[in-house]
Swiss-Prot record:
Claim: Protein biosynthesis is one of the keywords in the record: yes
Gene3D superfamilies in alphabetical order: 1.20.1050.10, Glutaredoxin, Translation elongation factor EF1B, gamma chain, conserved domain
Record-linked PANTHER family: ELONGATION FACTOR 1-GAMMA
Subunit structure: EF-1 is composed of four subunits: alpha, beta, delta, and gamma.
Key words, A-Z: Elongation factor, Protein biosynthesis
Gene: eef1g
Record-annotated EF-1-gamma C-terminal domain positions: 281-442
Biased composition (Basic and acidic residues): 227-242, 249-263
GO cellular component: cytoplasm; nucleus
Protein's recorded name: Elongation factor 1-gamma
Functional note: Probably plays a role in anchoring the complex to other cellular components.
Entries under InterPro entries matching the protein: EF-GSTs, EF1B_G_C, EF1B_G_C_sf, Glutathione-S-Trfase_C-like, Glutathione-S-Trfase_C_sf, Glutathione_S-Trfase, Glutathione_S-Trfase_N, GST_C
Length: 442
């Protein structure tokens, strides 16, 4: 039976998966989430920790026998028993299916909707409304599946239930008020059944369902942002004033440091977004000359204003042909695509693995067709004149599964493709299948 230590920060929902799995399997698990055993931002930056867990991320697991694991799903899987993992090849595959579903379909919209209500992310109305629609779609899929089932896989709780429940936890606690969750009674019945099991309650405590949808709090968001240091004012006056200035400045700096520390603690405790504080790596695009095209400004136009009348004209008016390039990508293996939601997993999974590329890229990737008859293609905008993926080993996992063709930005073909893919509407003559759904990388 597994025995070891789980390193995490308090209230990390990703760590809950491993903790609940251990409750079911009987694995002996020590939790290191507070000093002196673990201090987030210090312990996970130490040479000893990085020697076992090179990314410095938590949760991280170290067995009493020295066996080490990172990534929450891998840890939860290791700490599970055969019943949780699926006792047949079919059941095991279904468990993996729902674990992937949670990562690619639940977490992105849940984060986009919930994080602003916690004050750790700026509110964007269009992004929030889109996230709500995606959450509705996810809940509808679950509701239909659970219509004739008690649990997601088989007749007993599995790692599928544990993972999806933990992914939905903040939604149910923060924003899924009674009116919103009313159309999905099967999901709520299943969720409540799970969180009231002794093994769940030991880890989660009493889970209170949301009564009123939490909203973005601008004041709370402002309080959680790092404070900008005020410029030092020069003292006027005699020698006595000059002597006092260094002491006064030292006190001010200490106070500023204390104020800065508080938001980081709150953010760390509330959400996995604290993991954003990773060591800065060298910018892969540092060798390129500065461009006049401000990608972030275009993304704001695209997110907040009409695509056809505002965002697209802005794009072409400001696009830097020397500093950026436009590419058409097409998935190489359409014959392997089956269920639509699983095909979308390929897109969202790729987006997640390219997270650090977002500052220098934009893409609209679309799934066309229906179940067992679909294809994937998209338009990508990259900093520079070459594909960005070779610039970092972290970006090379998925791109070889696509064919890439650089477009002539002055051609009618390019303008038509950009228009259709950015707007998610048009004839898409080169595809030959109807639009199913799209994903935006920004």
């Amino acid at each position: 039976m597994a025995a070891g230590t789980l390193y995490t920060y308090p209230e990390n929902w990703r760590a809950f998966k491993a903790q609940i799995a251990a409750q079911y399997s009987g694995a002996r698990l020590k939790i290191a989430s507070a000093p002196p055993a673990f201090t987030f931002g210090q312990t996970n930056r130490s040479p000893a920790f990085l020697g076992n867990f090179p990314l410095g991320k938590v949760p991280a697991y170290q067995g009493d026998d020295g066996f080490c694991l990172f990534e929450s799903n891998a840890i939860a899987h290791y700490l599970s028993n055969d019943v949780l993992r699926g006792s047949t090849p079919q059941a095991s595959a279904q468990v993996l299916q729902w674990v992937s579903f949670a990562d690619s379909e639940v977490i992105p919209p849940a984060s986009a909707w919930v994080f602003p209500t916690l004050g750790i992310m700026q509110f964007n109305k269009q992004a929030t409304e889109q996230a709500k629609e995606e959450v509705k779609r996810v809940l509808a899929v679950l509701n239909q599946h659970l219509n004739t089932r008690t649990f997601l896989v088989g007749e007993r709780i599995s790692l599928a239930d544990i993972t999806v429940v933990c992914s939905l936890l903040w939604l149910y606690k923060q924003v899924l008020e009674p009116a919103f969750r009313q159309p999905y009674p099967n999901v709520t019945r299943w969720f409540v059944t799970c969180v009231n099991q002794p093994q769940f309650k030991t880890v989660l405590g009493e889970v209170k369902l949301c009564e009123k949808m939490a909203q973005f709090d601008a004041k709370k968001f402002a309080e959680m942002q790092p404070k900008k240091e005020a410029p030092i004012k020069k003292e006027k006056g005699g020698k006595e004033g000059g002597k006092q200035q260094p002491q006064q400045q030292e006190k001010k700096e200490k106070k500023k440091e204390e104020k800065k520390a508080a938001p980081a603690e709150e953010e760390m405790d509330e959400c996995e977004a604290a993991l954003a504080s990773e060591p800065k790596a060298k910018d892969p695009f540092a060798h390129l000359p500065k461009s006049s095209f401000v990608m972030d400004e275009f993304k704001r136009k695209y997110s907040n204003e009409d695509t056809m009348t505002v965002a697209l004209p802005y794009f072409w008016d400001h696009f830097d042909r020397e500093g950026f390039s436009i590419w058409y990508a097409e998935y190489r293996f359409p014959e392997e695509l089956t269920m639509a939601f699983m095909s979308c997993n390929l897109i969202t999974g790729m987006f997640q693995r390219l997270d650090k590329l977002r500052k220098n890229a934009f893409a609209s990737v679309i799934l066309f067709g229906a179940n067992n008859d679909s294809c994937i293609s998209g338009i990508w905008v990259f900093r520079g004149q070459d594909l960005a993926f070779p610039l970092s080993d972290d970006w090379q996992i998925d791109y070889e599964s696509y064919t890439w063709r650089k477009l002539d930005v002055d051609s009618e073909e390019c303008k038509t493709m950009v228009k259709e893919y950015f707007a998610w509407e048009g004839e898409f003559k080169h595809v030959g299948k109807p639009f199913n759904q799209g994903k935006i990388f920004k």
